Amino acid sequence: YFNHPDSLTLENQEKISQALDTLGYKKNKLAKVLANGKSEFIGIIVPNLYLHYYSEMLTQLLSSYSNYHYKFLVFSSEHGAEEEQQYIEELLSYQIEGLIVLSHTLSSQKLASYQIPVIAIEREAEYISSITTDNYMGSLQATSLLIRDKCDILIHINVNVEKTVPAYDRIRAFEETCKEYQVPYDIDLSVSGNSYQEILNVIRRIFTRIEEKYPNQKKGIFLANDTYANMFLNLIFQKYGYFPDTYELVGFDNSPIAS
């Protein structure tokens, strides 16, 4: 009945179905796993959930259940490589069929050593499969927009990204485009922190520095992601009560917060 219902007559199928309803039968997923060796679990590791990009990506991944029926086990690895390795060992104990990694903690070579399918999203992925956006083109378009809008100084705000990480191309494209068009620019890679508040404090210091260093100039600010851009926007409104024409902001990621 469960594996080959077509081998039964419709009458017998109906009888069995009624009996199961009477008995209050519920499907036993564990029995199915033991029978076919497939857990239908996929592990997901994100670095945090306070950056809107990661929370939105997680939302999109989880919403795929209705189409593909895979279940997800999710860990947030905010405290280093040792913790992330423990999470992966825990996931492996559930016989996950694959792993989706958005964190940057473990090398792709280490991830490949676990001998399961691994998909990286926007991170170093020399030894595993990966999905990335065209970071260079996105940065080029953002920088070109600020140049076309005749900003006096262009400023890029980011973390100190390693060159092996795809997002480094945002920094590279910004600098190369500014040099090509011979426009003044400033790159600030001092953003860091392990919480939303810590990052906001850094963005606030950067905002204060920019205010002091570039008064009365039209400042074109290209921020590494939409969360940073939203923080910066709020700081502008907190100071001025409106959005002055001495600022133009561009984020990256198309997170819902940018709407």
PLM regions: where:
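N-terminal helix-turn-helix DNA-binding module of bacterial transcription factors
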Residues: Y1-K38
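Short gly/ser/thr-rich secondary-structure transition/capping motifs
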Residues: T22-N28, E82, I100-S103, L233
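Alpha-helical recognition/docking segments in bacterial nutrient-uptake
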Residues: G37-S144, E212
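Secondary-structure boundary/capping motif
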Residues: L8, Y53-Y54, E83, V165-P166, ...
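Bacterial carbohydrate/catabolite-sensing allosteric modules
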Residues: D21-T22, S63-Y68, L92, I116-A120, ...
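Generic recognition of short, well-ordered alpha-helical segments
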Residues: K29, S55-M57, Q86, Y168-D169, ...
